[in-house]
Design a protein with these regions (language model features):
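Conserved ABC ATPase signature
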Residues: 56-60, 64
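Catalytic Walker B motif of ABC-type/P-loop ATPase nucleotide-binding domains
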Residues: 81-84
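Conserved ABC ATPase "signature" region
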Residues: 19, 34-52
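H-loop/switch region of ABC-family ATPase nucleotide-binding domains
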Residues: 116-117
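ABC ATPase nucleotide-binding domains
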Residues: 143-173
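Helix N-cap at the start of a conserved alpha-helix in ABC-type nucleotide-binding domains
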Residues: 92-94
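H-loop (His-switch) and adjacent beta-strand-loop-beta switch element
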Residues: 129-142
Length: 173
């Protein structure tokens, strides 16, 4: 979730936020099992959050908070993960930790969908890219998606014929 939708004054600790990612499985008022606690500890370790596990979320830096939110999403045993701008406004160290975890999940056969607008590192991070501009413009290998021709066709020379059709139908001329 975007930070604007999070009440940072809510009195909740890092480990509690992360565990809330599996409440659908365990229920709101039940204690986490050994399995969930093991997964929590693994995520805390992988994303280097263990030393702040008992800290209130209001005390976290932007990168720490983003790592907590990614860990929360990863608490579920999903086959598909959708992450909305996980690298926005964070330090390079947090970005690298999150990307390392994402790559690990991908190697485990998980599908990771990421909304990402900064193309500068896309070739390092993603093996396939979907380009959108009003509609699907391209889906395929990163190298092809990032070609000058493809990017120009999608974002510079893009023409939405449906908008032209709509405006000509609404015209009184």
């Amino acid at each position: 979730p975007q930070k604007a939708h999070i009440d940072l004054d809510f009195p909740i600790k890092v480990d509690q936020v992360i565990l809330s990612g599996c409440y659908e499985d365990i229920g709101w008022f039940k204690k986490a099992s050994v399995v969930e606690k093991t997964k929590l500890n693994q995520l805390l370790n992988d994303l280097e959050l263990d030393h702040i596990r008992h800290r209130q979320i209001a005390e976290l830096s932007g990168g720490q908070l983003q790592r907590v939110l990614v860990a929360r999403a990863l608490m579920s045993n999903s086959d598909i993960y959708c992450l909305d701008e996980p690298f926005v406004g964070i330090d390079i160290y947090s970005e690298q930790l999150i990307m390392k975890k994402i790559k690990h999940l991908r190697h485990m056969g998980k599908l990771i969908l990421i909304v990402h607008h900064d193309l500068s590192k896309a070739d390092q991070y993603f093996d396939r890219i979907l380009l959108l501009n009003q509609s699907l413009q391209f889906l395929g290998p990163t190298k092809e998606a990032l070609s000058s021709e493809r990017l120009n066709a999608t974002f510079i020379n893009y023409k939405d014929d449906s908008l032209l059709t709509l405006s000509s139908q609404g015209s009184t001329n």
